[in-house]
Amino acid sequence: MSVKVISPFSQDGVQCFPKLFIISAPAGAGKTTLTHMLQREFPDAFEKTVSSTTRSARPGEVHGVDYLFVSEDDFKQSLDREDFLEWVFLFGTYYGTSKAEISRVLQKGKHCIAVIDVQGALALKKQMPAVTIFIQAPSQEELERRLNARDSEKDFQKKERLEHSAVEIAAASEFDYVVVNDDLITAYQVLRSIFIAEEHRMSHG
């Protein structure tokens, strides 16, 4: 890939090749909020992939920004065409990250951030080089509190996600980095430092 990105963390305009970063977490750990913070601070350097899903949009979600909301038939057609680098069927819903979506971001000369579930993250890393980051709540009790505070999901959905979180947390050791989101600002600074370290490794070999 010939397109390079100017490091947002460098004062001297250091350039490096754009890279794929995968961020995963149990529902309620804060991965979406932390990713949005990174994009707001560095809009020219980072861009999130837009995953496809068959679930309905939640209040405030925008098609083409948060997700590509598609029918189950359309999703299965994409599967038949082998459009996805990774896909999962979770909680009765299909989710997938397409090859075209990752290429779209990287070819713009931006670091690509894929915010996906743990199963998809580990599958995607087998397909192409990536830095994997796991966001974790400080405790299971805090994760449950955050999930219960959500108004966008029904009680049985929250229960399903909480039960599934144990499986996801058990896979944290398979990731390159683990960030504990106890305090949002502190967690963001840790996440930011990971990107600085990875850019330094890319820039200086």
From Swiss-Prot:
E.C. code: 2.7.4.8
Compartments where located: Cytoplasm
Top-level enzyme category: transferase
Pfam family, one: Guanylate_kin
InterPro entries: GK/Ca_channel_bsu, Guanylate_kin-like_dom, Guanylate_kinase, Guanylate_kinase_CS, P-loop_NTPase
Family classification: Belongs to the guanylate kinase family.
CDD domains: GMPK (cd00071)
Catalytic activity: GMP + ATP = GDP + ADP
Keywords, ordered alphabetically: ATP-binding, Cytoplasm, Kinase, Nucleotide-binding, Transferase
Gene3D superfamilies linked to this entry: Guanylate Kinase phosphate binding domain (3.30.63.10), P-loop containing nucleotide triphosphate hydrolases (3.40.50.300)
Entry's Gene Ontology molecular function annotations: ATP binding; guanylate kinase activity
HAMAP family: Guanylate_kinase (MF_00328)
Gene Ontology CC annotations of this record: cytosol
Name this protein carries in UniProt: Guanylate kinase
Role summary: Essential for recycling GMP and indirectly, cGMP.
Domain Guanylate kinase-like as annotated: residue spans: 18-196
Positions bound to ATP: 25-32
Domain of life: Bacteria
